[in-house]
Amino acid sequence: MHEVTRRDVLRGAGVLAGATVVHGAAATSAAEAGPGGAAGIGQGTNISASVSPDGKHVAFDLVTAIWTVPIAGGDAVRLTGDDIDATQPSWSPDGRTLVCQAYRDGNYHLYTLRHDGSGLRQLTHGPFDHREPRFSPDGKTIAFSSDRGGSYGVHTLDVATGAITARTDTAAEEAMPAWSPDGRRLAYTVDSTAIDVLDLGTGATSRVVTAPAGASLYGPSFAPDGTLAYVRVAGATAELVVGDRVVSAKGEDVFGFAPSWLSAGELLHTADGHLKRRTLDGTTTVVAFTAAVPVVPRPDYHRKVRDLDSTREQRVVGIASPVASPDGRQVAFRALNALWLLTIGDPVPRRLVADGYFNSDPDFTPDGRSIVYASDRTGDADLWQRDLATGDERRLTGLPGAQTAPRLSPDGTKIAYCDQDGVVWVLDLASGALTQATPTLFMPGRPTWSPDGRTLALAAVKPYSRRFREGTSQVLTVDLATGTLTYTEPMPHASIATRGDDGPVWSPDGRYLAFTVESCAWVVPVDARGRFTGPARQVTREVTDSLSWLGRDRLLYLHNGTLRAVGVNGRGAKDIPLSLRYRPARVRRHDVVRVGALWDGSAPRLRGRSDIVLADGKVEAVLPAGSRPPTVDATHLTAMPGLIDAHVHWHLRGRHWGDRQGRLWLAYGITTTRSPGDPVYQYAETREALESGDRVGPRYFGTGEAVDGSRVYYNFMRTTRSVAQLELELARARALGYDMIKTYVRLPVAYQRRVVAAAHRAGLPLSSHYLYPAEHIGMDGMEHTGATNRLGYSHTVSRLGRAYEDAVELFVRSGMSITPTLFNSAGIYDNDRTLVEDERTRTLFPSWEYAQYVAKADAAQTPANATTLALLAANVDMVLRIHRGGGFVIAGTDAPLDNPAVSLHANLRAKVRFGFTPYEALTTATRNPARWLGHAGELGEIRPGAQADLSFVTGDPLSDIRAAAAVQLVMKGGALHTVDDLLAPFATHAAVPALVTTAPPAVHNHDEAFWWHEPEWANHYCG
């Protein structure tokens, strides 16, 4: 067990000031706290607490640190620093020691520390998580929960020896253990819907509490007399229950943690942002505390911003899904919204398919004479085959839904592909027969065939437990004859880099699978069924993406926007010359647009009839309407700045939405999007296609894959397990022109510090899912009011959606942005279905997406919507307090996890319904995100020098927020679109015969052995 010094504990936390303690609180020097000083925080969101055995002190967690405060209240003393990331303290029986969970090294482990914060010692190690520790009454044992057994179970640790014993071992998720007063029993939650009690002597378990339907249970705790207390949450209600009696007040926001008992008739628990003493006869007293939390203003660094006026020719780096021909002489890929064919040795590629639709994922037939690919030219993504010599096209599928990511079998008789639900199908080209190869998978990778055509392999996620969704991206093999599924880690506790184009890919001779792990290429020897026959071997040590075999013994890959090849022995790496360039498209003309009214994005009221004078795609002047005829007569409309959705993921379902997506955003007046995470080469390709004018859609700022920790969930998150790998991720970001960097849920604080420093040196802002210590280490923003968190709950909103002083004050004081992504805004469809029924929505939504949207709107008519609206009101209240306090709120939706385009308007309407003025709401979707992007004055406003990104609407959006969606015309960079023009490609479709037009229904039988198999759309937040 490694002991860490107190200086280690507090280093970097802004709480070590020459070891000086002032008024019982850890002091913070001006140099350490920065110019912002310290905020005196007296409320905490989702804090947990534990009373010392003598009843004199309370230990609690706040801003992911452990603090103590006298039971009478007063100044809180901080015991741990930022990098320890410690929560959920529990006292030893002698009152000298605390145990807590801490995320110091990328997994949750148990630590002890003395009551003064010294003597920090790590008790558990390894790749599994260890959480929720509680000392036994005799102090000899610590009970905790862990996923070390394949699901969450209750374990005990012998304090003297460190030996760990599993106490429960079932498929259920067992957590939050609590000791009986005599130390002979443990109570714990089961799947959050029940509480069981284990007799440690006999091993017998008994069910003591079962939650009502729709309720969850948290934090069991035994009273001195053995009565069980716990927290019950149902809908918009959270209650503290003792025995069979609710002891909390109506409307109280009880946090989901175990109470501590002061006596048989009094306990301490956390609720409403406070530490509360509560007697069972109903008396409540707040234990007031003041915690000095360091606050720093956002770092002042030189921002890298896009030159929105540039017409300079640029090298294409957005080379999406490259694949080599069987003879190794050609490469097919997508770039600039077209499919291309490169003959190796001739750097100038030939453009194959460029009809304006979304054409993607080419693959060669075995003879190399044709490619198959996916295209939405007939409405949805279908499979097509193109003869490379003649250009003749053949439609292979005309099925409902999307058919994407095709891969031909080695003999050319079959195609494996993925549908919109994550099911892999096999199409027999001779008969047209379709066979379902896999159940529904969560965002799987592109399949690859064994040489004998009997097995498929692909990347798929396997979580560590049901309780927390993260896991590793593994090699999934599918025996096509038996349907047997087999998961194999590429290396112990490692992930395939992304579940897209990073493998696995089978070598032509069947000897190897190749894949990318930690941004480098590896090969592993396999048998005919894809079973590993030896350890994986590293092939490259530079940034490596998008693997394809180039003949039998070489690999094709992308290195920071350059095609390269290398031998499987790691030798002979060299560039494959490719000459492909583009110029940003710019409007070159002068226009005068006359409007009936104008909101300039700044003033709180409309201007009257105005002329917007445009020159070369920018606003030259805004003048009172003149007498000369305008170029564009929009006198029946109101002009406003184009809206900005600051949290989207273009390519989370990009293959399914295809060309519809950009058109939909424009049709709803959204002229700029920001993505905090997308598959990097899909992002780069779409960004360049939009800039070049080869694709229709809004501006696209963003980043590649988010930098994650040791575990992942989404297919576009990168596991990062070493500093060396972190440097590779940052090198990719610099080379491929990211606009920002997002760090994701499992990245530890020490790594996050490194990313912040490197990103700011490169001029890039950052965002994450965390407020603290992100605020203190220089992060620029936070996504969501409180979504997926490695804790399993948020420290910015409670389970009832409420935020307290810690969250609001730190946002206001620090200047960090918050992007709310109000998923509960679907509640507004209880009295307003105009967005659902709008022609733009009905035309541009894929049919299956529209059906889900209608179902969501229908749910707003049910009694359950009362809970949705209560949570929504709480979320908006938080955001409004931040906004009116001077904080930095930028609108974003998490589309397509929430519905593209329409969800931004639903968010705006929800803000207004629960307290924002229309002006305030619109500011969060125009001027504010423009400032975050570094384009204040260029985007989000109508003023001289701004880009001509304009939306022309019917009505007054400052009086009726619904008018912001009543778009008739939209302009991006001076290029004018009518709504009819945007809808036209998907309003009607030519009838094109297809090889197969009917498919058997997919079987979604849920196999408990693979409980995590589910469609991506079943999860509605990026969290």
Region spans (language model):
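Active-site microenvironment of metallo-dependent hydrolases
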Residues: 3, 287, 292, 306, ...
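N-terminal export signals
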Residues: 2, 8-29
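Short coil/turn segments that connect the beta-strands within blades of beta-propeller domains
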Residues: 54-56, 94-96, 138-140, 182-184, ...
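Active-site neighborhoods of metal-dependent hydrolases
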Residues: 729-747, 793-914, 987, 1000-1023
